[in-house]
Amino acid sequence: MLANSNKLVKKKILWQAHEGNISGANLAMLEYIDVLQNEFDFSVILPHEGSMKQALVKRKIPFFVIRQYGWANKYHWWAFGKWMKILLRSFKAITQTFRLIKKSAPDIVFTNTLVPFTTSVAAKMTRRPHVWWIHEFGKEDFGFTIGWGNEKWAWKWMQVSSQLIIGNSRAISSKFSNLMPKVKIETIYQPVSWQKRETKDSVKKARFLMFGQLIESKGHKDVIEAIKACKEMGKKLPTLHILGPSENSEYLKELNELVHKNKLQNYVHIEIGYFNKEEVMPQYEVLIVASKSEAFGRVIIEANKAGLHVLVRNSGGSPELINASNGVLFNNQNELIAALSGEKLFPDSTIRMNYNESLEVEKINELLYSL
């Protein structure tokens, strides 16, 4: 065991996922399970079936599907039908989770992200230590509030129901420390898995890459506008590929129209789908993260492990991952233009990460065994 080799019995952890499919927060959960399996026995609650089921089966992690509503939506008080569905479903989910905790007797109960809440209630009822893992700002990055819009009440409940809250960046921990001063909040930088592959073709497809879901908060428009400005000012035009899934057809249409309207088709390429990061990233030189409120920015770590430098907006938790060896920060459009056009140079030293993953794993191990 990492820090507890003298312990003969591993602690049992029951972990509530916020959704049934693999997403950023669920991927973080899986990565923690992978690195902590020698220290803890895990089981997981899924709110519905999805791709997480296969990932857990592969790891031989027991899981339970308990259907439930989160508390990240807002409804009018007169929507009696909706409120009744939430009440009945939540009561059933809390009851099922209560029985599961009584039967499986976990030593610690986790809630992953701000979205679910029912497991925190069941943990409180059974007097089990509860840890809330926060991976997002909420309103700033995904546009939602918790507690069905009554956030002050939600913050009070999170403090009362939790022995520990973990933020995945100092920016996250800082925000929620101000909102929840009566509970212990710690920052843990997550381990990021990476399977290094041999690159067959050394020729790069483009200089810059934006990788991940196409949503407005990721800042694609700002980058395309900066390339447009490079063209208008007669500066060197960079090549940019935007790769990732898209569920917002209107936003995708706006991006394509922006490219075509400014005749940037030879410089900006947008491709929709799910891509293998280990295969795709090495085909580029620099990853761009232009999000206005990125909580952690795991894609930055992935890019660095792939050998890419990064160009990152100085906002949210992302700047915490940048140092003089691995990338460049930009504060405004002029600085973005300078980096895209080559006027601002990137580091030419060996890339190093801003934190030691092994030390972070040891830290979380010690925190959990102290509960």
Q: Predicted regions span which residues?
A:
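Aromatic "clamp/platform" in nucleotide-sugar-dependent glycosyltransferases that forms part
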Residues: 292
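Short hydrophobic beta-strand element within catalytic cores of glycosyltransferases
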Residues: 300, 309-312
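Glycosyltransferase donor-sugar binding loop
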Residues: 45-51, 192, 211, 239-253
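Nucleotide-sugar donor phosphate/pyrophosphate-binding loop at the beta->alpha transition
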Residues: 92-93, 129, 138-161
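Carbohydrate-associated surface elements
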Residues: 171, 191
